Amino acid sequence: MTSKRKIKKQNLTIKDLITVGIFSAIIFVCISLSGGPFAMFPALTFYFPVGASLLAGPVYLLLIAKVPKTGPIFIAGLLMAIFCYATGMHIGMTIGYLAGSALADLLAWTARYKSIRINILSYIVFCLGGTGSYIAYFLNPKAWVRRMLEKGTPEEYLDTMTSAVNHRVFLTMLAGTVFIALLSGFVGSKLLKKHFEKAGITA
């Protein structure tokens, strides 16, 4: 009987799904507001993941506090992946968000969603999912450009982008994403400290 109650408690309820939907939408808006401007300019597009990490940290941590169960983090990433796919972004971005959110959910689960430090680390992994498209570019630039031309991306945009990129940009993108995500998560943990204490989440 106890094990049945435990399983039932771990399952997502309708209320949980509504909460996840609302917070996922807010995370999407945060990512769009802080990362979107970078994607608009070809010379800055590789810094999209860095900008995208800036605002969503507090919302991400609050989502975990509200629904400390397996699934919400992946659902948030799944919605991002669906949006990326539907809007014609490179498939690497879709795969990145799917993989990043799955790993982020698994990481938070290892501490049963009750460790602020692990949850912040989980957020960093989630944000690194946004580098998927750009990692695909560095693995095979010609195939990446060819694919984006097929999807209708202006050649002028791609020419400017490729002329501005090098391995230093790639490393800066990765390091910047980790740093900004860490900063966003840290600020979020301070802003929401009382809420976390109430939810039983510790350092």
Tell where the protein language model's regions lie, with residue ranges.
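Interfacial aromatic-anchored transmembrane helix boundaries in multi-pass membrane proteins
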Residues: 35-44, 80-108
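Short helix-perturbing small/polar motifs within transmembrane alpha-helices
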Residues: 29, 97-134, 185
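Short, charged juxtamembrane terminal tails flanking transmembrane helices
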Residues: 2-6, 193-203
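Hydrophobic alpha-helical transmembrane segments
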Residues: 17-22, 50-51, 73-78, 94-95, ...
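Hydrophobic transmembrane alpha-helices
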Residues: 2-71, 75
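Membrane-embedded alpha-helical hairpins and interfacial helices in multi-pass inner-membrane proteins
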Residues: 45, 120-193
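Aromatic-anchored segments of alpha-helical transmembrane domains
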Residues: 24-32, 79-87, 125-135
